[in-house]
Amino acid sequence: MTTILTRPADGEGSVQVHQDPALNIQEETLVIAVYGKGGIGKSTTSSNLSAAFSKLGKRVLQIGCDPKHDSTFTLTHKMVPTVIDILEEVDFHSEELRPEDFVFTGFNGVQCVESGGPPAGTGCGGYVTGQTVKLLKEHHLLEDTDVVIFDVLGDVVCGGFAAPLQHANYCLIVTANDFDSIFAMNRIVQAIQAKAKNYKVRLGGVVANRSADTDQIDKFNERTGLRTMAHFRDVDAIRRSRLKKCTIFEMDDADEAVQAVQNEYLRLAQNMLDKVEPLEATSLKDREIFDLLGFD
C-alpha cells in the first residue's frame, strides 16, 4: 500500500510519497534509477544499459515509469501494454493477473515492464510505480533478478516521480553538455539529497549523452562533487537503432562507431556491478549555475 505523508526531514516539509517497507527490493539486487531532462535520451540509455548487463550474464528487469510507455520498445521491438492498463481491465483485482500479462521478454532475456501512469493532470505517478513493484513482488519476479533499472519520466522531481529513488541503490543522471540539461540535473541532485536522508539511494554519477564535448558538464561536476561515468557522443548509429526499434547491441558489429558505443555501455555496466563509490554531491543555487556555465 502507498501512503502520502508529510515529513519535514524528507524534502523540507513537502508532501512526499512513501512506499510500504514491504515493497522494498531485496538487498542483493542492484537497483538503478535513471533520471534526466525530458528528451535527453534516458530510455535509450536505460535500454542499452539493460542490454549491456544482460550481455555480462546478469538477469535484468527494466521498469519504464512514464505514461508514454516507450521505455522498453527497443528491447521488445514493440509497444507493450502498461501495468495500469492491465489493472484497469481486471478492475484493479491484481490477484487475477499472471506475470505474462504485464512482463514481457526483450533482447537477450531482459524482462520489461511499463508501469504507465494516470491521465494527464490526474493521479500520482508514484502510486503507479508502487503498484508495479507490488505486483512484481506478489509474483516473486524480483527474487531471480540481479539488476533492476527504473527509467523515470523527464526531470520531474515531485514526490510521485521521485518514488523510484526509494527503491534504488544508485541514481544515474543523463545529461548533454548544455545549460538546460545541466540545470535539470541540478534539480535532480536536490531531489536525491532529500531522499538520501531517509533512503539508501545515492548518486552513482553522470552519463554524458549526445555531446561531442563535456566541458560544461566537467565544470558542474567539479563544483558539485559529481563524476562522469560514461560519455556517448552524438553517433548516428544510436539514432538509427531507435528507428529500427532495437538496441545498439543489435546493430552492425562491423561498424567501429557501433563497437565503441557497445564497449562504453559494457564498461558502464561493469563499473556499476563493481559497486561504484557513492557520491556526496552538493547542488547549486539557480544563480550559481547561471554564473558557472557558459563562456566569458
Curated annotation (Swiss-Prot):
Q: Which reaction does it catalyse?
A: chlorophyllide a + oxidized 2[4Fe-4S]-[ferredoxin] + 2 ADP + 2 phosphate = protochlorophyllide a + reduced 2[4Fe-4S]-[ferredoxin] + 2 ATP + 2 H2O
Recorded GO MF terms: 4 iron, 4 sulfur cluster binding; ATP binding; metal ion binding; oxidoreductase activity, acting on iron-sulfur proteins as donors; oxidoreductase activity, acting on the CH-CH group of donors, iron-sulfur protein as acceptor
What does the record's cofactor remark say about binding?
Answer: Binds 1 [4Fe-4S] cluster per dimer.
Identify the residues that bind Mg(2+): S43
The keyword Iron appears for this protein:
yes
Any coiled-coil ranges, and where?
A: none
BP-aspect Gene Ontology terms: light-independent chlorophyll biosynthetic process; photosynthesis, dark reaction
Residues recorded as binding [4Fe-4S] cluster, renumbered to this chain, are C124, C158
Which residues hold ATP? G39, I40, G41, K42, S43, T44, K68, N209, R210
Keyword 4Fe-4S, does the record have it?
yes
Per the UniProt entry, the Enzyme Commission number(s) are: 1.3.7.7
Q: Which pathway does it take part in?
A: Porphyrin-containing compound metabolism; chlorophyll biosynthesis (light-independent)
- What InterPro entries does its record include? NifH/chlL_CS, NifH/frxC, P-loop_NTPase, Protochlorophyllide_ATP-bd
Which PANTHER family does the annotation name? LIGHT-INDEPENDENT PROTOCHLOROPHYLLIDE REDUCTASE IRON-SULFUR ATP-BINDING PROTEIN
Q: What does this protein do?
A: Component of the dark-operative protochlorophyllide reductase (DPOR) that uses Mg-ATP and reduced ferredoxin to reduce ring D of protochlorophyllide (Pchlide) to form chlorophyllide a (Chlide). This reaction is light-independent. The L component serves as a unique electron donor to the NB-component of the complex, and binds Mg-ATP.
Listed under subunit, the entry gives: Homodimer. Protochlorophyllide reductase is composed of three subunits; ChlL, ChlN and ChlB.
Would you identify the family this protein belongs to, as annotated?
Belongs to the NifH/BchL/ChlL family.
Name used for this protein in its record: Light-independent protochlorophyllide reductase iron-sulfur ATP-binding protein
